[in-house]
Curated annotation (Swiss-Prot):
Protein encoded by which gene: surE
This protein's name: 5'-nucleotidase SurE
Molecular function (Gene Ontology), one example: nucleotide binding
Transmembrane segment boundaries: none
Cofactor note: Binds 1 divalent metal cation per subunit.
Reactions the enzyme catalyzes: a ribonucleoside 5'-phosphate + H2O = a ribonucleoside + phosphate
GO cellular component labels: cytoplasm
Annotated family: Belongs to the SurE nucleotidase family.
Length: 259
């Protein structure tokens, strides 16, 4: 029996990364249910749309749908409306056209979709390339499918999903796979100011990709920079358990009561 993969992304349904991994999965005899945004929804994180109704459109008979919402909307509607009671074996988000490392994970719609899948207790993984500059998605999809197959054999811990970044180098030059921790920082942050013909001010938030040379050992940055596939386990539970103990020892609650 074919394994069922739920596929989404944040770059939109026409993204080359989405098409490449979809085709690769079908070639590998997976049943692929694709539910993707109808446009680029990068940077939407884990947001759901509550302020307007959403529309699902079937664009191919072969289980291919688009939604006029965020990646998390696609997962939410795909699982509850399209698949209903049929649970997929795995949820894949990507392949993202650019990295999702370090602080990117807080803003990424690609990562947000994988997190949404995890909330539904579905093994989930977010795939991204190490650079947006001319990625070879055919090579990247080959590497991604190896991880997909491993996920169907080895179980993830409950409440955990994977954030995977694959270097944009020829597949034969990739040095291997590393389990990594999340780094810090991702872009040379900048805000660009524009003036309209009527002299109104506008601002563009963005930044240049900047894999820093001074990366800490063991991070997603370092792995990708050194030619390895970075595999970072991310938990749903964001609680800082060490901080609870520290604040308790510092009598933080007692101090609040005293004031």
């Amino acid at each position: 029996m074919k394994k069922i993969v739920f596929l989404t992304n944040d770059d939109g349904y026409q993204s080359k990364g989405l098409q490449a991994i979809r085709n690769r999965l079908i070639e590998e005899n997976f049943r692929v249910i694709t539910v993707a945004p109808d446009r680029n929804m990068s940077g939407t994180s884990h947001s759901l749309t509550f302020t307007r109704p959403l529309k699902i459109e079937k664009i191919e008979e072969d289980f291919y749908y688009i939604v006029d919402g965020t990646p998390a909307d696609c997962v939410h509607l795909g699982l509850n409306v399209i698949l209903q009671n049929q649970k997929p074996d795995l949820l894949i988000s990507g392949i993202n056209t650019g990295p999702n490392i370090g602080n990117d994970v807080f803003y990424s719609g690609t990562v947000g979709a994988a997190r949404e899948g995890t909330l539904f207790c579905i093994p989930s993984v977010a795939f991204s390339v190490g650079s947006s500059k001319n990625p070879n998605f055919e090579d990247v999809s080959k590497v991604a499918v190896k991880i997909v197959k491993a996920l169907l054999i080895k179980n993830l811990p409950k409440g955990t999903f994977l954030n995977v970044n694959i270097p944009t180098i020829p597949a034969e030059k990739i040095k291997g796979f590393l389990l990594t921790k999340q780094g810090r920082g991702a872009y040379k942050e900048e805000i660009v100011k524009y003036l309209s013909p009527s002299k109104e001010e506008y601002y563009w938030i963005g930044g240049e990709e900047a894999l820093l040379e001074e990366c800490s050992p063991g991070t997603d940055y370092t792995a990708v920079k050194d030619g390895y596939v970075s595999i970072t386990p991310i938990r749903l539970d964001l609680t800082d358990h060490k901080a609870i103990d520290i604040l308790d020892k510092e009598n933080f609650i007692s101090e609040i009561v005293r004031l």
